[in-house]
């Protein structure tokens, strides 16, 4: 199966928990009528994947301070030719940006978000992001990559750090509901 086919299947099978995300799902599926929708070269907007990295043992989440947008965000980014699924994209990005090996994804996407970004090579573009939750192994140690200004653990039960955005707050709420207390 190709990444494009997986994206169509994943989004077709996903039920948006809100009317806003149901509308986003339809927008993503419309974008996927163009086979280049998983490529960063598509200026009209392209699919990306992200993962909120959580440590369920210490009830904490790992966020990065994004170099370009200056917000605390989950790990995530563009699809690469070697990726076979959206889950692969999310897991690869989470591993690269957190430095944590042996992450595992909870099943299925947990949120969708559409956001404008300064994106190479197209200049300003739109990311059609599919978000997952990645779980750390016990005793995981993070490592800052050169893509971020900072990398920090925050309480999963506290408020999301500032500055961030509503999509991150929604993702954190969903992660809380998926993890055992």
Where are these regions (language model features)?
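Active-site segment of metal-dependent pyrophosphate-handling enzymes
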Residues: 99-140
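NUDIX/MutT-family hydrolases
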Residues: 142-173
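Predominantly extracellular/luminal regions of secreted and cell-surface proteins
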Residues: 1-27, 98
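Acidic, metal-coordinating catalytic segment for phosphate/diphosphate chemistry
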Residues: 15-50
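Histidine-centered active-site/metal-ligand motif
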Residues: 46, 66, 78, 115, ...
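Conserved Nudix-box catalytic region and its N-terminal flanking loop in Nudix hydrolases
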Residues: 59-100, 157
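Short, well-ordered beta-strand micro-motif
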Residues: 53, 133-135, 153-155
């Amino acid at each position: 199966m190709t990444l494009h086919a997986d994206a169509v299947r994943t989004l077709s099978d996903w039920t948006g928990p809100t009317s806003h995300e149901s509308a986003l799902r339809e927008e993503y599926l419309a974008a996927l009528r163009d086979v280049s929708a998983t490529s960063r070269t598509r200026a009209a907007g392209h699919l990306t994947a992200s993962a909120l990295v959580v440590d369920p043992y210490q009830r904490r989440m790992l966020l990065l301070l994004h170099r370009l947008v200056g917000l605390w965000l989950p790990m995530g980014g563009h699809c690469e030719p070697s990726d076979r699924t959206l889950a692969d994209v999310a897991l690869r990005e989470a591993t690269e940006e957190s430095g944590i090996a042996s992450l595992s994804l909870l099943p299925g996407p947990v949120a969708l978000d559409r956001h404008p970004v300064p994106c190479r090579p197209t200049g300003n573009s739109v990311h059609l992001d599919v978000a997952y939750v990645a779980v750390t192994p016990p005793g995981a140690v993070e490592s800052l990559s050169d893509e971020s200004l900072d990398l920090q653990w925050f309480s999963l039960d506290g408020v999301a750090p500032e500055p961030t955005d509503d999509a991150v707050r929604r993702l954190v709420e969903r992660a809380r509901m998926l993890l055992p207390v």
